[in-house]
Every structure is written in structure tokens, then in C-alpha cells.
């Protein structure tokens, strides 16, 4: 798959996330995708490590119930071979506490044969933890 096709897949996942379309989110993910939000998380209502599309269905369901998305903004896209790196920021409300989380993030998507096999997100874990403390 070409770099542009990989980039398009990531953009489609983001559109799915923004519009709550689970099918669009899961479509480009490999069955055994390795998904991790890097950092120390104790209070947030979702684990940081997920394996496979089935687990990710649960993850995105939990996110939809736990968060109100006020802003989800990918700002920069960097593509190199089988990797797409995206820099962005978000503003979300933790439904359980009513607290607002504003954080910048970097997401690294790794592709093989046109499917996402690995995802890593680097964000402000302290901001997320304080929203649920």
C-alpha cells in the first residue's frame, strides 16, 4: 500500500472517531492490531493496552461512554513508508467528574499490507489522571 493510502486510512479513522462510526474506525485495523496509549494510567476508566479488533470495539465503546469530545484536532501528518505520525490536540470532558482535559498528543500508526498493525499514542497522562482523580 502506498504512503498516501496509509494516510487516507488514518484520516478515515479520525472521521469515524469524530462521528462515532465504529465501523470506520475498525475497518483499516489488522485483526491482531497492537494498540497502546503510552504512560502511567491508574484512574482512567479504560486500560492503556489493547490487543486485537475485538478488544478495540470495547475500548471505543468505553471512550464514547466516558468522554464528551469538544475538540479533536489532528494538526500535522508525517508519512514515511509504513508509518504515519500525527501531531494534534484535544479537549474533552470526563463525564464521570465533569473535568475538562486539554492535551496535545502524538500518534504513531504502523501499517503492513494496508492494515494498521501497531498504534502508539503519547499524550499528557498526568492531565488524564487528574481528570479522573
What does each model-identified segment do?
Residues 1-31, 131-133:
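Short, low-complexity N-terminal intrinsically disordered segments enriched in polar/charged residues
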Residues 1-4, 8, 47-54, 100:
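Residues at secondary-structure transition points
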Residues 24, 30-81:
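A solvent-exposed, acidic/Ser-Thr-rich amphipathic alpha-helical stretch
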Amino acid at each position: 500500500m502506498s504512503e498516501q493510502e496509509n494516510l487516507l486510512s488514518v484520516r478515515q479513522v479520525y472521521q469515524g472517531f469524530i462521528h462515532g462510526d465504529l465501523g470506520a474506525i475498525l475497518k483499516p485495523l489488522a485483526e491482531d492490531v497492537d494498540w497502546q496509549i503510552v504512560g502511567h494510567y491508574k484512574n482512567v476508566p479504560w486500560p492503556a493496552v489493547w490487543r486485537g479488533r475485538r478488544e478495540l470495539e470495547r475500548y471505543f465503546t468505553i471512550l464514547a461512554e466516558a468522554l464528551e469530545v469538544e475538540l479533536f484536532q489532528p494538526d500535522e501528518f508525517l508519512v514515511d513508508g509504513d508509518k504515519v505520525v500525527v501531531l494534534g490536540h484535544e479537549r474533552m470532558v470526563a463525564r464521570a467528574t465533569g473535568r475538562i482535559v486539554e492535551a496535545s498528543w502524538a500518534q504513531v500508526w504502523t501499517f503492513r499490507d494496508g492494515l494498521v498493525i501497531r498504534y502508539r499514542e503519547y499524550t499528557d497522562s498526568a492531565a488524564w489522571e487528574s481528570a479522573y482523580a
